[in-house]
Amino acid sequence: MIHFTKMHGLGNDFMVVDGVTQNVYFSPEQIKRLADRNFGIGFDQLLLVEPPYDPDLDFHYRIFNADGSEVEQCGNGARCFARFVKSKGLINKQKIKVSTSSGKMTLRLERDGSVTVNMGIPVLEPSRIPFNAKKAEKTYLLQADMPEGMQTFLCGAVSMGNPHCVLEVDDVANADVERIGSLLTKHERFPKGVNVGFMQVVDANHIKLRVYERGAAETLACGSGACAAVAVGQLQGKLARRVRVDLPGGSLTINWEGEGKPLWMTGPAEHVYDGQIQQ
């Protein structure tokens, strides 16, 4: 039997598994079955806690989408990861250092129960996002063949450990997230696919955001997407250093001191239930 915990960060939900004290392996087919909301446990991502590869770190953090693919980053998942390892007694520190497939992260458990995550320095160089463009720009033109014909979108592109494309919209509630997101997420200029954010700027300290996630469709919240949107908005001169991001599942606070500096995200992480499955 494998023990797991169901958690969520603003409705972005996870199956979290301790791979430190348990010997676990999940095939892509198993993950797809477990992610099914009718016949499985149901989740956006599976989070796996593994022993560190570096003695200076506490854990290795792996993320698998509902379609079974492994991805580089998940900000909401990182907050749940921190709460999980502390509550399960895997660590007794407030500050936790982890590695992911895209780098290293610092997670900090706050007194009010929220978690602050150092999401790293936003990557703007196109080849490292990866995004096919000659040079880094604040705004790119992205052409897509829509059912009604060729359409051009203005977007920002950034990596937060995973690739993001951010579009500004006038009214996020009425944005065609499913249709546009499902096309742009596989756009040829993003060789590894892309998460697509739809951002409405309320004022310099407040945005509303919906995200179509690569491999998972639209979710109630996307932490790395919130960070990407704030980075793009700030680079375009529309946002301040501290921004409240309202997502369908709730709000996050993002702090960024500007280019070349790490971006910090603070938000909740909630325990739902503990369970076990047969391997």
Curated annotation (Swiss-Prot):
GO terms, molecular function: diaminopimelate epimerase activity
EC main group: isomerase
Compartments where found: Cytoplasm
Keyword terms, alphabetized: Amino-acid biosynthesis, Cytoplasm, Isomerase, Lysine biosynthesis
InterPro entries named in the record: DAP_epimerase_AS (IPR018510), DAP_epimerase_DapF (IPR001653)
Pathway the protein acts in: Amino-acid biosynthesis; L-lysine biosynthesis via DAP pathway; DL-2,6-diaminopimelate from LL-2,6-diaminopimelate: step 1/1
Cellular component GO terms, alphabetical: cytosol
Protein source organism: Shewanella loihica (strain ATCC BAA-1088 / PV-4)
First-listed, main subcellular location of the protein, grouped into a coarse class: cytoplasm
Assembly with partners or alone: Homodimer.
EC code(s) of this entry: 5.1.1.7
Catalyzed reactions per annotation: (2S,6S)-2,6-diaminopimelate = meso-2,6-diaminopimelate
Protein name: Diaminopimelate epimerase
One Gene Ontology biological process: lysine biosynthetic process via diaminopimelate
